[in-house]
Design a protein with these regions (language model features):
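ABC ATPase NBD coupling module
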Residues: 65-80, 104, 224-227
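Conserved ABC ATPase signature
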Residues: 133-137, 141
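Conserved ABC ATPase "signature" region
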Residues: 110-128
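Helix-to-loop junction immediately C-terminal to a conserved catalytic motif
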Residues: 48
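Catalytic Walker B motif of ABC-type/P-loop ATPase nucleotide-binding domains
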Residues: 158-161
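Conserved catalytic motifs of ABC-family nucleotide-binding domains
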Residues: 154
Length: 245
């Protein structure tokens, strides 16, 4: 589904991605873990085309979308995204946020409004919130709205950027379970970046660890606890001492 080959990204003289190789199977939920500044968000932005890598190849659904420093347009691939913090539009009502894609593509107001209600119901929110603004909702409810927006286009792939950041443990667990359920319902492939190991263990089929711009470990969530990789051991146990500094 998603294949990344020898991907490099620099910012001035700093190498952020250093030859990343990654293959994500269709219909799976993959999670990339790693500390702050390890290149997780940069990798997602490169896949989305928000940043241009210096070198490497990116393919999605057997379609080559990036090679030789250039992106190739492909309108056949539908992508959903839940940004860190939700990234809702403060000036738009909740239904307008959820139906933003449909509104931008000229769908009529009645369709957009009703479709927003349907997608909000899928994440456990009722029609009482549709005319509110994001600032009138709690952080957990805003994340649900963002998830409703991400699934509204029935995407082939959904990217999640730190989906539980800023949430209390109960709200985080709700979001994790909604991610599992909704990704399965629409048959999407998902890729999540997080430093929250509880979330990673809950939603993943496979886990990758990114450190200093390189994938240094990969495996399923059942094997990560038994790995002897010192970087992984330090990270998943939150240890101050170890090779990560």
């Amino acid at each position: 589904m998603i294949t990344i080959e020898n991907l490099h990204k620099y910012f001035e003289n700093k190498k952020v991605l250093n030859g990343v190789n990654l293959h994500i199977e269709e219909g799976t939920s993959s999670v990339i873990i790693g500390g702050s500044g390890t290149g997780k968000s940069v990798l997602i932005k490169c896949i989305l085309g928000l940043l241009t890598p210096e070198e490497g190849r990116i393919s999605i659904k057997d379609n080559l979308i990036f090679e030789n420093g250039k992106f190739k347009k492909n309108n056949k691939i539908k992508i959903g995204m839940l940004f860190q913090g939700g990234a809702l539009f403060d000036s738009l009502r909740i239904w307008q946020n959820v139906s933003f894609y449909n509104i931008q593509n000229g769908k009529n107001k009645k369709f957009c409004f009703e479709d927003a209600i349907l997608n909000l119901e899928k994440v456990g929110l009722n029609k009482d919130v549709v005319n509110l603004y994001p600032s009138e909702l709690s952080g957990g409810m805003q994340k649900r709205v963002a998830l409703a927006r991400a699934i509204s286009i029935k995407p082939d792939i959904i990217f999640f950027d730190e989906p539980t950041t800023g949430l209390d443990p109960i709200s985080a667990d709700v979001i994790n379970k909604l991610i599992i359920e909704k990704v399965r319902d629409i048959g999407a492939t998902s890729l999540t970046i997080t430093h929250d190991m509880s979330s990673a263990r809950t939603i993943s089929d496979k886990i990758y660890m990114l450190h200093k711009g390189e994938i240094i470990w990969e495996g399923n969530k059942d094997t990560i606890e038994s790995t002897e990789n010192p970087f992984v051991v330090q990270f998943i146990n939150g240890l101050s001492e170890g090779p990560i500094n």
